[in-house]
């Protein structure tokens, strides 16, 4: 019922995906007929509402029996530390019989249930294995290649089946869709006001080598790690200003987050707020999903901002500017328009209204007067 409520709320506000993640009770390796049928019915319920659904599996750091573990080249025993060859503690060798069974169970789950989202938290991190009895590799020298090839083949299988992949590692060329934007998990236990700035810093720093849609962020609707009431958004209707800041931080950057909690809204006012920002993102989705030009990094001392650019779209640029201060900001900034494809003239529309023409300088820039309300946000379209 909790998952169905999440599906219903996603459909109501325009969200598109539900992930049953760690702590939810989801058991992707449970291959009992009754459990698989329950998950199949849940997938049908989600599909009827236009929602993609799937779940989580821990691979690295999950622990392992000695016969299945990645064996240290230095000690001859299961590796438990980085010095012994393990990136995240005691982990299985996925080129073992255990690994074969693991991927067989995952494929069976998706084939049987029809679910189409997989979050592989702790993908294969590159641990070598010195075992000479594992069925999938000969020894230490081929162990990394064999393990990497096995998980890469699985991700390619997922991609071919239309399964969306959240993978916290750089497996994009193997079929993965998203990796973390670059946050530190314990930051989401800090007071809410800290999280607002840190979130924008993560987005700013995480989009030099990624497009916005390649990196996922995190919003702790309920407590995550720690921090208590000061760090969480629940009750949602009591923290609407903060909730809106998080939504505009993310949707204004074209970045999707994992909203961790059982619900997206708790009152009609909260529902309208979330719906408003989802609709905003979808209206400008093409340009908001486009590459980012970095204007000013967030530091909590002055304005910060980013600009999406896409020379192939009608909207050549989308500027998002934020004000962390208790007073309004009004100033001239230089906006570099080279990557918009514009060469002579640009039309700037504050919040998509009342276009004003600007002539580009020789370096393809314009000088733009921005206005941002206290603790607020503003945006500009360039055509």
Language model features with spans:
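Active-site-adjacent "subsite" loops/lids of carbohydrate-active enzymes
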Residues: 37-44, 48, 52-115, 124, ...
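Conserved structural scaffold segments of CAZyme catalytic domains across common CAZy folds
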Residues: 1-69, 100, 257-302, 310-317, ...
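Active-site-proximal substrate-binding groove within the catalytic cores of carbohydrate-active enzymes
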Residues: 151-355, 369-371
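C-terminal beta-strand-rich structural cap/linker in extracellular carbohydrate-active enzymes
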Residues: 359-383
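Structural preference for beta-strand elements that scaffold enzyme active sites
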Residues: 17, 50-54, 116-117, 162-166
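Active-site groove signature of glycoside hydrolases
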Residues: 16-23, 103-136
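The substrate-binding groove and active-site-proximal loops of carbohydrate-active enzymes
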Residues: 1, 21-36, 84-103, 135-147, ...
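Alpha-helix-loop-beta-strand connector modules within alpha/beta enzyme cores
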Residues: 39-51, 143-163
């Amino acid at each position: 019922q909790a998952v169905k409520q999440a599906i219903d709320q996603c459909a109501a506000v325009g969200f598109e995906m539900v992930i049953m993640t760690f702590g939810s009770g989801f058991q992707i390796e449970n291959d009992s007929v009754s459990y698989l049928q329950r998950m199949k019915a849940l997938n049908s319920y989600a599909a009827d509402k236009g929602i993609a659904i799937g779940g989580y599996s821990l691979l690295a750091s999950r622990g392992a029996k000695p016969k299945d573990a990645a064996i240290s080249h230095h000690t001859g025993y299961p590796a438990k530390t980085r010095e012994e060859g393990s990136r995240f503690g005691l982990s299985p060798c996925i080129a073992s019989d255990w690994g074969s069974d693991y991927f067989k169970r995952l494929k069976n789950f998706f084939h049987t249930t029809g679910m189409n989202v997989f979050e592989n938290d702790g993908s294969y991190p590159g641990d070598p294995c010195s075992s000479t009895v594992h069925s999938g590799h000969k020894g230490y020298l081929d162990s990394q290649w064999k393990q990497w090839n096995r998980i890469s083949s699985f991700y390619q299988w997922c991609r071919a089946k239309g399964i969306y992949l959240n993978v916290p590692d750089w497996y994009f060329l193997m079929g993965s869709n998203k990796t973390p934007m670059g946050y530190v998990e314990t930051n989401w236990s800090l007071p809410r006001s800290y999280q607002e700035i840190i979130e924008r810093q993560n987005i700013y720093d995480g989009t030099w080598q990624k497009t916005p849609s390649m990196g996922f962020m995190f919003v702790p609707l309920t407590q995550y790690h720690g921090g208590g009431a000061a760090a969480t958004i629940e009750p949602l209707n009591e923290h609407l200003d903060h909730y809106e800041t998080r939504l505009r931080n993310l949707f204004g950057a074209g970045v999707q987050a994992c909203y961790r909690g059982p619900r997206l809204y708790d009152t009609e006012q909260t529902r309208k707020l979330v719906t408003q920002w989802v609709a905003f993102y979808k209206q400008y989705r093409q340009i908001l999903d486009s590459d980012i030009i970095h204007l000013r990094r967030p530091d909590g001392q002055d304005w910060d901002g980013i600009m999406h650019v896409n020379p192939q779209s009608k909207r050549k640029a989308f500027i998002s500017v934020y004000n962390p201060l208790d007073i309004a900001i009004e100033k001239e900034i230089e906006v570099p328009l080279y990557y918009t494809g514009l060469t002579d003239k640009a039309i700037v529309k504050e919040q998509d209204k009342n276009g004003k023409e600007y002539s580009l300088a020789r370096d393809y820039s314009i000088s733009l007067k921005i206005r941002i309300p206290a603790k607020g946000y503003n945006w500009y379209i360039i055509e």
